[in-house]
């Protein structure tokens, strides 16, 4: 970002043509993390006022090969699709080491395919490239650990496979 006083005069972009300075008349910061605003010198508030803590990042993944009948039976038996009872049992045995107490999954259109939105990565700063890289590494490990627990303990996931993992937090 290049400024002329308090006005953004150019955005510096990098693409296949290299670095380019693009003149601006008006700028809408649609980065999602206030990148342009922060680089232009605007005051940016990040995280909670009292400690700066931000919402945990998550690394979603898709699994297929889920036995939906077995999964549905377990949900009806426990009257919960969050598997709280199972998570508490696994936490008591020391197998569930994650900092959250629920399992979140969403049925997708393909039979036996679910999106898992359960990972929670605390202390990831979405505005810092290094923090995002470390968070991505932690997230991939967490996906592997969570999926192994799912296959061992969650009804319907015994023969499931990881179909895809999100490319970004």
Q: What does each of the following model-derived ranges do?
A:
Residues 1-10, 14-26, 30-169:
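Flavin (FAD/FMN)-binding glycine-rich loop and adjacent Rossmann-like elements that form
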């Amino acid at each position: 970002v290049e400024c002329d006083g308090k006005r953004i005069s150019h955005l510096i972009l990098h693409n296949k043509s290299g670095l380019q300075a693009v003149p601006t008349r008006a700028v809408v910061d649609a980065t999602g993390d206030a990148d342009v605003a922060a680089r232009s010198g605007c005051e940016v508030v990040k995280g909670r006022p009292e400690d700066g803590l931000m919402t945990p990042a998550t690394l979603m993944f898709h699994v297929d090969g889920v036995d939906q009948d077995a999964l549905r039976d377990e949900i009806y038996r426990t009257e919960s699709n969050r598997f709280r009872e199972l998570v508490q049992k696994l936490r008591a045995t020391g197998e569930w080491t994650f900092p959250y107490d629920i399992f979140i999954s969403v049925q997708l259109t393909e039979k036996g395919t679910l999106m898992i939105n359960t990972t929670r990565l605390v202390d990831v700063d979405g505005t810092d490239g290094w923090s995002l890289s470390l968070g991505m590494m932690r997230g991939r490990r967490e996906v592997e650990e969570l999926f192994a627990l799912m296959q061992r303990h969650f009804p319907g996931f015994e023969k499931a496979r990881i179909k895809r993992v999100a490319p970004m937090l």
